[in-house]
């Protein structure tokens, strides 16, 4: 199926531990992201395939990138537009997961760029739980709004 690179869907997993909110974020895999931290983490997300329901795409992408099956109910967080112009539709769900045991799908990329050599890397190399303020520092800047929206829904 063809994919639109300008529209994605994703899931923001959260939990409440001793009454405190924690946010589950994913760090992109591959050599380009190895040494990058602040502003690079993300909610598990990906492109919506033609004809695919955005919520179904968000659930599929979360499962592919983490090995975890999202469970309802899903809280709609609306859409955000990232710096490069991509729109991301997002939902939140409450659950728990051991971030150290995620299993991500693989992606093939040319590395080094322009070398003609293709290698496989996990799409997500690690996940972690963060307090909301630290999550806002770690996450892609445009996606920080999703944390704000989640907190507003939970208040």
Put a short name on every predicted segment.
Residues 3-5, 83-85, 119-124:
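A generic structural micro-feature
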Residues 128, 132-155:
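Charged phosphate-binding loop/patch that engages nucleotide di/tri-phosphates or the phosphate backbone
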Residues 35, 51, 138:
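Residues that scaffold the ATP/ADP-binding catalytic core of kinase and kinase-like folds
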């Amino acid at each position: 199926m063809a994919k639109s690179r300008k529209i994605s869907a994703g899931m923001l997993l959260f939990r409440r531990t001793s009454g405190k909110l924690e946010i589950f974020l994913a760090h992109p895999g591959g050599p380009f992201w190895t040494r990058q931290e602040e502003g690079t983490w993300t909610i598990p997300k990906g492109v919506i395939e033609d004809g695919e329901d955005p919520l179904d795409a968000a659930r599929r992408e979360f499962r592919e990138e983490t090995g975890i099956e999202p469970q309802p109910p899903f809280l709609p967080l609306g859409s955000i537009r990232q710096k490069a112009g991509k729109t991301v539709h997002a939902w939140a769900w409450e659950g728990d997961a051991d971030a150290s045991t995620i299993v991500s799908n693989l992606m093939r990329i040319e590395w080094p760029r322009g070398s003609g050599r293709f290698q496989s890397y996990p799409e997500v190399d690690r996940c972690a739980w963060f307090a909301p303020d630290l999550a806002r520092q770690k996450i892609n800047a445009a996606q920080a709004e999703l944390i704000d929206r989640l907190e507003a829904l939970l208040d």
